[in-house]
Structure formats: C-alpha cells, structure tokens
C-alpha cells in the first residue's frame, strides 16, 4: 500500500503538491454539520455519540477530499473525563466550575477511559470507513491550555486567572499539569490503538506566557506527553501546535521532541522556512484570508507554497476555520494548492 500523503510529509519526505487539511474542518461553516449538530442535542452529546461524531468527521472529507480527517471531539473532554462538570452554551462557549487548589489532588487520570469509550469507538469506526489514502489524526489539548479553562471555568482573553494561579500556587499548579499530561498521553495512546495515524497537541494559549512560564507550563508537560506516547507508539508522528509561540517555536520542537510544528499565521515565511530546515512544518494561512477570498486568498496560498513547498510541509490554516467562511473559498484554496500554482 502506498503511504498516506500526510504521513509521507510527516516522515520527512517532500510531497508537492503538499497534503492539505484544515483545523476545525468539521464545523459550522458546513450546512451538513449544522444539520447534524441539531440532531445531537448538545455539543457534548455530539462528541460522545460515535455515529454522529463519525458523520461530522467524514463530512469535509466527502465534500473536499482532504488528505486527512481529524477526529471530531473537543480538548475539554479530558477535564470532563477527570470528573469536572462541563457544558457548552451558545455565545458563551465552554463553562465549568473553576477548580480549587485543594481539589487538584483528588483528580485521578486512571479514571478517564470509562467516559471516553465513545471517543475511542468513534476513532475505530472512522479508520474502518476512511479510504486507504486518507490519514486519520487524533488529538488532545496541551496541559497548559486545558488548565486555563479548568482554573477560570471558561475562556478568558489573556488567561490571567491561570497565570495568577500558577504564580500563587506553583506546587498545586504543577500537580494539575502533571495530571492532565498523564491523562492526555493515555488518551492519545488509546486513539492510536484504535487507528489514528498521527496525533496533534493543541496549545492555543502558548503565546500568552513569559519565557520561564513557557518552559515550565508549556514545554515540560508536552514533552512528557510525547515521551509517554513514544514509549508505546515510537513511529507515530506527533504534531505540536503552540499557537503564538513566536521565537520560541524552535525551542518547542527541540525540547518537546514533536515530529512537526504547526505554525500560526503570524510566523513570517522566512522564519517558517528556517524552522522547516529542522523538520516538517504545517500551516499557516491566516483564516481571514480564507474568509476574504479573491486576491487576498490566492496571494496568501501562493506565498506559502513558494516559501515552503520545496521541503516537508502540510498545508493548513494558522488556526481553525471560522463559521463565516464561504465554502466556495475553501474549494478555490484546495484547487490552488492541489494544482501547485505558484
């Protein structure tokens, strides 16, 4: 069997035109997703219903033929599986009770699998339904980003509650990160056991930290996840996405040991090319260029292909696709990437 295109790139081979998939490619910009979401009831019900989660994962594959499917789930299923309450409210996003320092020792990463069984079933079904050419990506949130929601109880603009908690309660915060790391590593291992070809670690709030905190709260826990996953699955590629890491991207790769770097759209292409000399990169089109379409889109795609297409590379956005993105713009982008038009 020929190797899946995404895996070729992740294993260090230059593929042109490059493989393409999009973060949040199963989402509200698709009418078929919105219909399935209505059937599910709540967002969490959708995540935990294997039949519907498989359906929404496959929808962008059927429509666009991306080179990879990414499991439909959410990074916050880990705190939910650790016993924290979780709900999603329209317009407010995820909400949970803020965790207190004295509650952290009671979290047991060994208890997550009962609640996450439906997710593992989704992965198993997806691998059986996807074509041989289409890779399946599993994922988790990075411990720092997951912890920010557990401490604040919701998303906040600058993650001040989590930063303050970490400074005031360093011992308890380190314990929380260790617990999330252990749970996340086991979660990824199980996804790989069920058929995931590669995994991605999303650290959406990595860019909010100072250098010392980045080392302690971002690098150290992710390195532990990578170590544990590699013990069980040494050859499965791991993509790290520390959004906003700026000049610390290179340190992130070196100290965590991830296979590939996901780059956000603020990384200059000259710097992306330098990072690519160290290993595969993924990214990094500004999602607003995809919303805008036209010359803004075609120029963005052209610049990225020209700068990064000559070495191991996966075309993606620099963050998730937004709900207002026109489907026609996605189709135009895919066509330009697949034609390799510079």
UniProtKB/Swiss-Prot annotation:
Pathway per the UniProt entry: Porphyrin-containing compound metabolism; protoporphyrin-IX biosynthesis; coproporphyrinogen-III from 5-aminolevulinate: step 4/4
GO biological process terms, semicolon-separated: protoporphyrinogen IX biosynthetic process from glutamate
Protein name: Uroporphyrinogen decarboxylase
CDD domains: URO-D
Keyword Cell membrane: no
Signal peptide (UniProt feature, chain positions): none
Cellular component annotations (GO), alphabetically ordered: cytosol
Family: Belongs to the uroporphyrinogen decarboxylase family.
GO molecular function ontology, one term from the record: uroporphyrinogen decarboxylase activity
Chain's gene name: hemE
Domain of life: Bacteria
InterPro entries: UROD/MetE-like_sf, Uroporphyrinogen_deCO2ase_HemE, Uroporphyrinogen_deCOase
């Amino acid at each position: 069997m020929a190797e899946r295109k995404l895996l070729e790139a992740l294993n260090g081979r230059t593929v042109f035109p490059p493989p393409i998939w999009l973060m949040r490619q199963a989402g509200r910009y698709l009418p078929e997703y919105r219909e399935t979401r209505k059937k599910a009831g709540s967002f969490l019900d959708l995540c935990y219903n294997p039949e519907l989660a498989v359906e929404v994962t496959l929808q962008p594959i059927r429509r666009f033929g991306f080179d990879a499917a990414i499991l439909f789930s959410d990074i916050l299923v880990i705190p939910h599986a650790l016993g924290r309450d979780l709900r999603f409210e329209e317009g407010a996003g995820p909400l949970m009770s803020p965790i207190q320092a004295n509650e952290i020792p009671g979290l047991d990463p060994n208890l997550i699998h009962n609640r996450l069984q439906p997710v593992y079933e989704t992965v198993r079904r997806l691998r059986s339904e996807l074509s041989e050419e289409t890779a399946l990506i599993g994922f988790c949130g990075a411990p720092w980003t997951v912890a920010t929601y557990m401490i604040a109880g919701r998303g906040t603009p600058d993650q001040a509650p989590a930063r303050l908690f970490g400074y005031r309660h360093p011992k308890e915060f380190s314990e929380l990160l260790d617990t999330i790391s252990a749970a996340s590593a086991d979660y990824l291992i199980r996804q790989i056991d069920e058929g995931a070809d590669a995994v991605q670690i999303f650290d959406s709030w990595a860019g909010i930290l100072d250098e010392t905190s980045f080392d302690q709260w971002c690098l150290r826990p992710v390195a532990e996840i990578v170590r544990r996953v590699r013990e069980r699955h040494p050859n499965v590629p791991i993509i790290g996405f520390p959004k906003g890491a700026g000049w610390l991207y290179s340190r992130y790769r070196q100290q965590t040991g991830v296979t590939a770097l996901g780059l956000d759209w603020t990384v200059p292409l000259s710097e992306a090319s330098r990072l690519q000399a160290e290993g595969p990169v993924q990214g990094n089109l500004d999602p607003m260029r995809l919303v805008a379409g036209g010359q803004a889109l075609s120029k963005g795609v052209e610049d990225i292909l020209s700068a990064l297409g000559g070495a191991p590379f996966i075309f993606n956005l620099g963050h998730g696709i937004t709900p207002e993105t026109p489907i026609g713009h996605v189709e135009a982008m895919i066509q330009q990437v697949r034609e390799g038009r510079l």
